[in-house]
Amino acid sequence: MHINQLLQHANSDLPLLQANFGLERESLRINKTNHRLAQTPHPTALGSRQFHPYIQTDYSESQMELITPVAHSSKEVLRFLGAITDVAERSIDQNQYLWPLSMPPQITEDEIEIAQLEDDFEFSYRQYLDKKYGKILQSISGIHYNMELGADLMNELFELSGYQSFIDFKNDLYLKVAQNFLNYRWFLTYLYGASPLAEKGFLNEELSQTVRSIRNSHLGYVNTDDIKVPFDSLENYISSIEHYVKSGALSAEKEFYSAVRLRGSKHNRDYLTKGITYLEFRCFDLNPFNNRGITQETIDSVHLFILAMLWLDTPKKLNQALDKAQKLNDKIALSHPLEKLPKENSASLIIEAMEALIKHFKLPSYYDDLLIAIKKQVENPKLTLSGRLFEHIKHASLEHFGQKKGQDYHNYAWQNYYALKGYENMELSTQMLLFDTIQKGIHFEILDENDQFLKLWHNDHIEYVKNGNMTSKDNYVIPLAMANKVVTKKILRENGYPVPAGAEFDNKDEALRYYSQIKNKPIVVKPKTTNFGLGISIFETAASHNDYEKALDIAFIEDYSVLVEEFIPGTEYRFFILDGKCEAVLLRVAANVVGDGHSTVRQLVAQKNRDPLRGREHRSPLEIIDLGDIELLMLQQEGYTLEDILPKGKKVNLRGNSNISTGGDSIDVTETMDPSYKQLAANMATAMGAWVCGVDLIIPDTNLKASKGKPNCTCIELNFNPSMYMHTYCYQGPGQVITGKILAKLFPEISTKI
C-alpha cells in the first residue's frame, strides 16, 4: 500500500491522536528599568548550562531557551512549559522580565553578548553565526514544536502498510509529513504569524507596511539564497546538506534552517540505518497573549494539521511545488495582518482533510470546535494572531505592548510564589521540590501524581522521592517507628532523652477508668500513630469527665489506640533535621483569632481564612482554620461560643496543638534559637536513625542552654516526612530554604558543578 493513502484505509479505532510532544521556547531577558536587553550573565540560580535539560541560552547570553521534557500528551507538554517558564521568571533578576514577542525591542549589536558557554564548539559556532548573519538577526525568538507519532499508532500503520522494513516505513512516513508541511506551511503562517513589525534599527530598510510575520519571511532567520536542500528523498536530503557542509557553505548540518527538521540522530546519515525518530517544526512565532508563548488550542490545532499532512497526498512534482509554496508563504508572511489569504491558496483542501480526519476517526467534539475556530480565522483575518496583535501597534511600535505584557507575565509568576504553576494539585512540599529540581537541572518524572511519587536523575544516578523528603536515605523501618508514638518514646527514653509520661489504651472504657488518676492534672489526649496534629486534644488545666470523654472519641476516630500523656508547660518548637544537622526552627502558634470589638468568632475565622496564604491539603503555606469538634471544645474551655463578639485585642486559641496543618501560624526563629537546642534535636534524630526528621520540643525558657544531662526541654514527638513549606514560607520571619538542601544531599555531584 502507498504511504499516501494509508490513513484512508485505517480502521476508525486507530489511536490517531497518540503522540509524544516537546516544546522549546526562546525569550530575551529585558531590564525593567530601561526596557533594553539585560546585560547580566545567565542567572547562577539556574545551575550549570553544561548539563541543564530545561533552561539553556540560545544565541546570546540574554536569550533564554526553555525546553520541555518529552510529554505523552499535548496537555502535559504545555504544563511542562508553564512550570519551566514559572521557574525561569522567578530565577532571573527581580528587575528583569522575559520579552513576550518574537521580534526584539530596540536593540544594537553592542548590547548582544554571545552566550558564554564552556563548550568550545558551541561558542565558536555562535561566533561564526555572528560573522555570517549578524548578531541582531539572532535576537529573533520563537517556539519549536516537536512531535513523534505514538508507538502503537506507528506499529498499526506499519502493519497496514505492507512495508518489510520498519525503518524504511518510518522514514517514508515522516518524510511525507515533512514534505506536506513545507507545502502547506503558509496556512500556519496565516493563522499564527505574530511578528508584524521590527523596531527601529532592526532592518536595513524599513517595511512599507505592517506585515503578518517577519520571522517567517525571507527577512527572518533563514539560510542564504544559495542553500537549496531537496526533500524529494531522504538520500537527496542528506547528501545535499553534506555537500554544503563539505563545501563550507554550511558550518554544520544544524545550520540548515528549514521550517521542519528531521530529528532523532546527531548525524543525518544515521537516519538511513536508525530511522527518523520525530520532527521538529520551527516556524511558530511567540504568542504574546499567553504567558507561555503558545496556547493549548494552538498545540492541538497544529497536531490536527500535522495529521492532515499525513492524510493529504504529496504533490506529484514535489520540488516545484515546494518552491511555489515557499513563495506563497513569503507572500502571506509579508502581507498585511488584516489581509485575507490570496486567491491561489488551497486552504479548503487543508480544512477538508481535517474534517475527513475528524469524521473518519470519530475524534472528540473538541476537534470540531478547533476546526470551527480555524474556519472563522480564515474568513476573518482580525481573528488571527497577527490580526489581534495589529490592534496593539502604537506609533509603528509594539514596545509598549511588549513591556506591559512581559511585566504582567513576570508578576503573574510571582503570584502564589510558593506554588509551581500547573502543579498546584500536588502537595506544596512536592511542588517546592519540583521547582528546585527544574531550577537546578535535574531530570524528573512524576511516577504517581496522587501519591506524590517522583523519579529524579542526573546521568546514571537515580533517586526516588515521595512527599518531598521520603527517600532511600531513610531506612524503611524508621518512619514506621516514628509513626508509632509509643515506640518513639521508648527509643528516646532508652537513649536518655526526656519524653512525657503517660499511658496507652486500646479501648474507650479502659481509658475512661484511667480518669481518676489524671482528673486533677493537665493532660494531652492523642492518637498513637497519627500525624499533622490530627485527633489531638490538649487540656492545660484539669479536664472535666465529659470533656475527657469527648477528647477520647476524637482520638479514637483517628486510630485504634490512644495515648493519654502529661501536659508539659512551655513553648513548642519544631526543629527540622536533615542528615544530622538542624536546618530550621519554627515557633508554631496554635490556630487563633484576635478580636476587633465588633465581629463574632465565626466572622473572625472567616476573615482570617481569606488570607491567600491559606489553603487546604498542604497546597498552601498555611491551612484553613476549621470549626470542627476540636475547635468548638477548645472554644468552650475558654468560655466562648462561635457567635460571641470578642473584645478588641482579645486573642482566643481554637486549638491546643500548634500544628500548621490544623490552622496554626508559623514563625521562623532559626537564627534566634540557642544552638544547644538545635544540636540536642539533631542528636535525638540521630538516636532514632532518621535522615529527615521533625523534632517537636517543649522549651520553658530558651535563655537556658540545653545539654543531654540537663536538657531543659521535653520531646513530645518525632515526625517522619516533616512539612518543609512552613519553614520556607512563614507567617512571620525570613524563612529557611529546605528543598534545595534535600536535592544537594541527594545529588552532591550537581551542587559541586553549580
Swiss-Prot record:
Top-level taxon in the UniProt lineage: Bacteria
Associated pathway: Sulfur metabolism; glutathione biosynthesis; glutathione from L-cysteine and L-glutamate: step 1/2; Sulfur metabolism; glutathione biosynthesis; glutathione from L-cysteine and L-glutamate: step 2/2
Annotated positions binding Mg(2+) 2: 717, 719
Annotated GO CC locations: cytosol
Residues at which Mn(2+) 1 binds: 696, 717
Enzyme class: ligase
Residue span of region Glutamate--cysteine ligase: 1-333
Pfam families, per the entry: ATP-grasp_6, Glu_cys_ligase
Catalysed reaction equations from the record: L-cysteine + L-glutamate + ATP = gamma-L-glutamyl-L-cysteine + ADP + phosphate + H(+); gamma-L-glutamyl-L-cysteine + glycine + ATP = glutathione + ADP + phosphate + H(+)
SUPFAM superfamilies according to UniProt: Glutamine synthetase/guanido kinase, Glutathione synthetase ATP-binding domain-like
Residues annotated for ATP binding in this entry: 516-574
EC nos: 6.3.2.2, 6.3.2.3
Binding sites annotated in the UniProt record for Mn(2+) 2: 717, 719
CC cofactor note: Binds 2 magnesium or manganese ions per subunit.
InterPro entries in UniProt: ATP-grasp, Gln_synth/guanido_kin_cat_dom, Glu_cys_ligase, Glut_biosynth, Glut_cys_ligase, GshAB_ATP-grasp
Any one Gene Ontology molecular-function term assigned to this protein's record: ATP binding
Key words of the record: ATP-binding, Glutathione biosynthesis, Ligase, Magnesium, Manganese, Metal-binding, Multifunctional enzyme, Nucleotide-binding
Start and end residues of each ATP-grasp domain: 489-752
Record text on subunit structure and interactions: Monomer.
Similarity section: In the N-terminal section; belongs to the glutamate--cysteine ligase type 1 family. Type 2 subfamily.
NCBIfam families named among the record's database cross-references: glu_cys_lig_rel, PRK02471.1
Name of the featured protein: Glutathione biosynthesis bifunctional protein GshAB
Phylogenetic classification of the source organism: Bacteria, Bacillati, Bacillota, Bacilli, Lactobacillales
